[in-house]
Amino acid sequence: MHERYPVNGGLAQLIVDQFPTGFMGYGIDVGASDGFSVNTTWVLEKHHRWTILSVEPNPEFHADLVKERAWVEKCACDSKPAESKTFHINLDNHEAYSALRPAMDYIEREQHEGIKTNKWGRIQVKVRTIDQLLEKWAFPRLDLLCIDVEGNEIDVLKGCDLKKWKPEMIILESWDKGTADEYLKQFGYTRVARHVYNDCYLLGVPEDK
C-alpha cells in the first residue's frame, strides 16, 4: 500500500484562473498515479466538473485510480504506440521516478538528497499516443494537457497533434525548468509560470508577458 498525499490545489487553482468562471473543460492527465496524491486534475474533476482522462501504466495505482476518477486508461504514453514495452518502476518511490526511460541523473539526485535507492522493477505495459487516447474516448476538444512522466515529456508531446488539438494550457512536471520551451514554442506556447516542479504553458501568449 503506497502512502497518499494531498492534492495539488495550488496548481489546480492556477489552471482554473486561466478559464472563464464556471468553465467545464476537457483534459488529459498522463502519469496520474493514484488520481489523488499531489494530483493537479482531481480538483478540476471533482469541484469544477471538468472531464478528465487519467492515464497511468503502473498497476499498483490502478485500484485507487478507478475509485477516484471517472475516466481511466491503463497504459503508458509515448511518441509511438506499442502493444508491449518495458516500464521501469523505482521500488523506493513509484510515483516520483518510474518511467519508460528513467533519467540517468535520478540516482545522482537521490544520492545528493541522501535517499537509498537503486532498486528497480520492470513490467510490460501497453503504450498509446495521446492522439489515440483522445480519439478512443471521443474528446470533442482538449483544453488542458498535463504530463508527469519523469523526463519523457517531449516524447509524450510528440504523440499529440498540438496543431489539431490546440489545448489552451499545458502543464509539464519537470525537475529542471524550461526543458520543453523550444519544442512548444513552435506550436505557439509560452511558459508563463513555474509552480514547484511544474512548468505551465499557455497558447498564444506573448513571450514578454
Task: Give the ranges of each region predicted by the language model.
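Phosphate/nucleotide-binding beta-alpha loop and adjacent structural elements of enzyme active sites
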Residues: 1-209
